[in-house]
């Protein structure tokens, strides 16, 4: 990352209205969509998504800004909801009649601490990033999936996730076509994002291949994305099995999840809000 110096003070966050305070516009000129550098940036991201299922943009957020985001995330820890769930990799109910080795009998464990959008302070840098039209347009251009909108849910639109020692995201396939995350702080060890490309297909859950992988991960090539602060990642996880490996050590693994959808006005129902945030209202 190219930005150096001290972190932006918390008091200054309220005044950080310029995108250049947050994003390294020298590396990522997302504020000028009509130039050759921007077009090359988008084309490269699309190509990586097509070939690898993930497009990473290291140093997207400046060092000073990402350090301030980390400080803010740690301060939010006491307000976070601890989410703990045992689930199949498909997020389908466990089927007890299946043989013990079947993927629909195998339970993964996910545990994380989450700050809902409503709990992230107004004027914070991570809110500024999410609310930026230039960032939205850039993500929209790279994903190339039709018009995108910011999620309208007061809890789910933007989340900060803290992973303490032993916490993880178990192996799973996403229910959405894509995800957008920002790495804010790396743990002392562990916490890597690991994935296996296209382990299932549209209309075919590929139970045999998935089961073999769960028995012996060496049957597939596991790709690894280390947690590097300031990196923006776009990932297609509907057909690629993935996880966050267990975190090791006292330093939190911190990332932000920026939620975008293909139609305006999308919100969670009360059940989903209670499940993921422990409450139904902001």
Task: Go through the PLM ranges and name each one.
Residues 48-56, 117-123:
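Glycine-/proline-rich flexible loop or hinge segments
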Residues 1-51, 280-282:
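Fe(II)/2-oxoglutarate
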Residues 61, 68, 72-76, 80, ...:
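Signature of the catalytic double-stranded beta-helix
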Residues 55-61, 226:
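Short amphipathic
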Residues 70-71, 75-96, 196:
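Short, solvent-exposed beta-strand-terminating loops
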Residues 118-127, 136-232:
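Catalytic core of non-heme Fe(II) oxygenases with the double-stranded beta-helix
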Residues 192-282:
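Catalytic core of Fe(II)/2-oxoglutarate
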Residues 46, 66-67, 136, 178:
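Short functional linear motifs
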């Amino acid at each position: 990352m190219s930005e150096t110096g001290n972190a932006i003070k918390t008091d200054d966050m309220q005044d950080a209205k310029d995108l250049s305070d947050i994003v390294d516009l020298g590396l990522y000129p997302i504020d000028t969509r009509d130039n050759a550098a921007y077009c090359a940036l988008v084309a490269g991201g699309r190509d990586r998504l097509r070939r690898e299922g993930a497009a990473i943009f290291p140093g997207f957020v400046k060092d000073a800004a990402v350090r301030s985001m980390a400080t803010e995330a740690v301060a939010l820890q006491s307000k976070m909801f601890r989410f703990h769930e045992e689930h199949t990799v498909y997020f389908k109910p466990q089927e007890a009649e299946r043989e013990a080795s079947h993927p629909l009998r195998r339970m993964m464990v996910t545990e994380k601490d989450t700050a809902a959008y409503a709990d992230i302070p107004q004027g914070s840098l991570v809110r500024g990033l999410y609310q930026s039209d230039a960032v939205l347009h850039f993500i929209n251009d790279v994903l190339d999936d039709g018009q995108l909108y910011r999620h309208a849910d007061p809890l789910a639109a933007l989340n900060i996730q803290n992973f303490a020692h032993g916490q993880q995201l178990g192996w799973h396939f996403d229910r959405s076509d894509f995800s957008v995350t920002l790495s804010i702080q790396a743990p002392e060890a562990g916490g890597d994002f690991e994935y296996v490309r296209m382990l299932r297909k549209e209309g075919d859950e590929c139970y045999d291949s998935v089961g073999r992988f769960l028995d012996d991960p060496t049957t597939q090539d596991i790709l690894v994305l280390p947690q590097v602060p300031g990196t923006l990642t776009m990932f297609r996880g509907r057909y690629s099995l993935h996880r966050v490996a267990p975190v090791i050590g006292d330093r939190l693994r911190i990332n932000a999840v920026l939620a975008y959808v293909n139609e305006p006005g999308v919100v969670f129902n009360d059940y989903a809000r209670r499940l993921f945030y422990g409450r139904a209202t902001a």
